[in-house]
């Protein structure tokens, strides 16, 4: 009997209030790194109706206009009218940054030399994951959820659906048979809209213009349940509808619940914070394992102690799909990847102003030129060392 089950993931648009906060935090991080790549940044953002609060810890030589960066980010997202929930021109922006605690800094302040034994900025555990469900080696439900809200934003920006507004959420339920995607079961899409659009017209346009062009044709089997703005009216949105906070969409940012999460958010954090850099490294490791043909699914856990460079643990789980044992793969990971914090920064070239782009539509599974953790440049070496044939996805 086939193992038949449903699995669901969600995403949110760049105009969702929590994502507004994430993008402001990462825009500030990028501006700082452009001037001082060795800065220590933990930039948190709160946004509500007409108000943005910037707080956290920043130690830098950079001279940054934080208020203008916040306004520019809100404008780029599309909040240029008070009717949308916040207006970049008129919102209040409060700045309350402190410097990094010297107790923390003493363990990580070797950033300017070539010593790769810079300690981790905190303790913690991080996960990386990859699977062969999509060419990008991502779980299908989160991949499709991201593409839906990306398309919503695209149609809003180019004016094809002029009544769309920045805030939106998506959710995709996929039916799996024997562990493989079989068909799309349910698609939910809720989008903020202008007050004068009638609900039937909105639903028809969303289904025909956003949802159907996004779904893979080979997974459209039978009747799919389309739930578009299922509560009806969605005029009040963005930071007016809900208070936005940095770091509240950590499952959207990663694998949509298909893999565990260590709990640490990404946005606003410089790469000395292993919450971010080690999660990126975990994705890099897992993706190369799958691309190498060592397994069709790979989960990596890595953990750290504050002030200590070497990971306290490295674990690989291939869920029985490995062509060699998990112990062998773990040994290969330790041999081919430097998972010390500064080793990760060097390996993935993370001292660059590349982070605002990560803050909406997922940190993983997007083959952007800046996203070094999506490369599969270690796959051939892993395959050769393990004695297996790599997949066709090696790049």
UniProtKB/Swiss-Prot annotation:
Catalytic activity: L-methionine + ATP + H2O = S-adenosyl-L-methionine + phosphate + diphosphate
Residues annotated to bind L-methionine: 57, 100, 242, 273
Record localization: Cytoplasm
Pfam families the record matches: S-AdoMet_synt_C, S-AdoMet_synt_M, S-AdoMet_synt_N
Cofactor(s) recorded in Swiss-Prot or TrEMBL: Mg(2+); K(+)
Enzyme class of the recorded protein, top EC level: transferase
Span list, region Flexible loop: 100-110
Cellular component GO terms, alphabetical: cytoplasm
Function: Catalyzes the formation of S-adenosylmethionine (AdoMet) from methionine and ATP. The overall synthetic reaction is composed of two sequential steps, AdoMet formation and the subsequent tripolyphosphate hydrolysis which occurs prior to release of AdoMet from the enzyme.
Family label: Belongs to the AdoMet synthase family.
Protein known as: S-adenosylmethionine synthase
Originating gene: metK
């Amino acid at each position: 009997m086939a193992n038949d089950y449903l699995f669901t993931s969600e995403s949110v648009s760049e105009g969702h209030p929590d994502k507004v906060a994430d993008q402001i935090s990462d825009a500030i991080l990028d501006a700082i790194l452009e001037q001082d790549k060795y800065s220590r940044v933990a930039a948190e953002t709160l946004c509500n109706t007409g108000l943005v609060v910037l707080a956290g810890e920043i130690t830098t030589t950079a001279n940054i206009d934080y208020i203008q960066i916040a306004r520019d980010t809100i404008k780029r997202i599309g909040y240029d009218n008070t009717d949308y929930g916040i207006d970049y021109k008129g919102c209040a922006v409060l700045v309350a940054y402190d410097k990094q605690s010297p107790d923390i800094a003493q363990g990580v302040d070797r950033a300017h030399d070539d010593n790769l034994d810079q300690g981790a900025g905190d303790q913690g555990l991080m996960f990386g994951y990859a699977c062969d469900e999509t060419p990008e080696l991502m779980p299908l439900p989160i991949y499709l959820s991201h593409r839906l809200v990306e398309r919503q934003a695209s149609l809003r920006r180019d004016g094809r659906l002029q009544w769309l507004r920045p805030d939106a959420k998506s959710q995709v339920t996929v039916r799996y048979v024997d562990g493989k995607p079989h068909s799309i079961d349910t698609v939910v899409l809720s989008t903020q809209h202008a007050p004068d659009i009638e609900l039937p017209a909105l639903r028809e346009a969303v289904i025909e213009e956003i949802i159907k062009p996004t779904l893979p044709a080979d997974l459209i089997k039978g009747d799919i349940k389309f739930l578009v703005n299922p509560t009806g009216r969605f005029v009040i949105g963005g930071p007016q509808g809900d208070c936005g906070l940095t770091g509240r969409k950590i499952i959207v940012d990663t694998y949509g619940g298909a893999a565990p999460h260590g709990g640490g958010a990404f946005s606003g954090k410089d790469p000395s914070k292993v919450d971010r850099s080690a999660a990126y490294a975990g994705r890099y490791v897992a993706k190369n394992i799958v691309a190498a043909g060592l397994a069709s699914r790979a989960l990596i856990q890595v953990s750290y102690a504050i002030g200590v460079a070497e990971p306290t643990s490295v674990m690989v789980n291939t869920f029985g799909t490995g062509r060699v044992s998990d112990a062998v793969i773990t040994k290969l990971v330790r041999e081919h990847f430097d998972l010390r914090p500064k080793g990760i920064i060097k390996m993935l070239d993370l001292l660059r102003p590349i982070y605002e782009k990560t803050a909406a539509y997922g940190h993983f599974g997007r083959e952007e030129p800046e996203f070094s953790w999506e490369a599969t440049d270690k796959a051939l070496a892993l395959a050769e060392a393990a004695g297996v044939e790599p997949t066709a996805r090696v790049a």
